[in-house]
């Protein structure tokens, strides 16, 4: 739940709805000057790949479906917990990612993108010198421990499990006639980065979570 106070008004936006906005942004990404989603590199059947990429971006937070249907409540305020409150429970967050990466078994490429999205959210704390190209906009100004607090043992174990999931998903993709061309670094890495970027843009429009590059972070599309 993205809970934002703005102009004396409380706004609540569910994680799945924010995800769909990210998918809409991705669907409109690209023009004559830069590449559309799914068309990076030289993939076979790029339009079909585009559908997988858009699904992965739009449903990157699908693991929240069950929680959002019956959200936890802050006992002091009586309001649904915001994202920062909910993420204090590391194990529950990882359980949601397990659900999210398994939701669409007939769409392994979309699921693979979701798994890489999860990987890079945790890598900012766990991996020594993580690749800055995949750093989520949430962390462009640092302080990942605010959203992902606690010891590192659980995240490390989770990321090891993600690696196993990714190998399985990659094999499922390779079973498709287009699979090999879809997994090349020049194809999949830009799609992962696009997910990170569209997620960040959607969060900036829906909340105050993304820090402004300068001045005060306003949220709700005002930055």
What are these regions (language model features)?
Residues 1-223:
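Metal-dependent phosphohydrolase cores
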């Amino acid at each position: 739940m993205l809970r934002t106070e703005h102009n004396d008004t409380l706004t609540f936006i569910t994680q799945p709805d924010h995800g769909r906005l990210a998918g809409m942004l991705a669907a409109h990404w690209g023009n004559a000057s830069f590449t559309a989603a799914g068309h990076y590199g030289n993939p076979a059947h790029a339009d079909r790949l585009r559908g997988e990429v858009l699904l992965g971006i739009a449903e990157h937070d699908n693991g929240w479906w069950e929680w959002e249907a019956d959200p936890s409540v802050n006992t002091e305020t009586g309001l649904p917990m915001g994202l920062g409150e909910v993420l204090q429970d590391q194990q529950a967050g990882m359980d949601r990612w397990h659900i999210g990466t398994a939701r669409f078994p007939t769409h392994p490429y979309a699921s693979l993108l979701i798994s890489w999205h999860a990987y890079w959210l945790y890598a900012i704390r766990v991996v020594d010198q993580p690749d800055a190209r995949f750093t989520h906009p949430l962390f462009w100004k640092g302080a990942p421990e605010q959203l992902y607090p606690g010891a590192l043992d659980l995240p490390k174990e989770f990321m090891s499990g993600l690696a196993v999931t990714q190998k399985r998903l990659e094999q499922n993709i390779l079973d498709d006639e287009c699979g090999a061309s879809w997994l090349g670094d020049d194809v999949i890495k830009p799609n992962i980065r696009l997910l990170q970027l569209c997620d960040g843009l959607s969060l900036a429009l829906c909340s105050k979570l993304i820090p402004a590059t300068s001045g005060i972070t306003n949220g709700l599309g005002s930055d």
